Amino acid sequence: QEDMGIGPAMMGGSGAPSDWVLAGREVMHGPDQHGAGAAMVTMNPQYRLNDPGVGLQDADHRVLVYEDLKARRPYPDQREPEREIELHLTGNMGRYMWSFDGDKFTEVDGPIRFNHGERLRLIMVNDTMMDHPIHLHGMWMHLENGFGELRPRKHTITVKPGEMLSAQIHADAPGYWFFHCHLLYHMHAGMARVVHVA
């Protein structure tokens, strides 16, 4: 495995705002660096909500970025998250493996568990060199992009290479819900999980 080596020079944009909720956070990698399903890891993940994406940094027109999005009114549930879940988007292109935390869908023991009614923070770290649009069925993700109570609600959030971002989730929908990369060949190769709200 290798460190992706992505630094601010590759990121584009002016960097994270001073009140970024993940500023100074240590990224968590297991002792096996997420196993064979991860060809590389991000040792220094970056704030990229202000990055328009590959090929658009020098566009002569304005490009909408996640840092621009704002809800029209506050979501009623403004509780602080009760807990955090850190999830790594992992891949090994040489072995055509895509996964969460180094484990393909067919290799996990059980679902990701949300407690019904809880508010939690989902932290996603992209340890690959590709964008991953991550879709949670059944519930909204409230992207933490600096707008506080006006966090935008999203069902799908694209996580850029080397990026770490977070979203708050109100686990208000009991049952089993699919959680996956929306690039279907990544999903079929294993970048998918089930969320169980109970």
Predicted region positions:
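Copper-binding active sites and cupredoxin-like electron-transfer domains
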Residues: 1-198
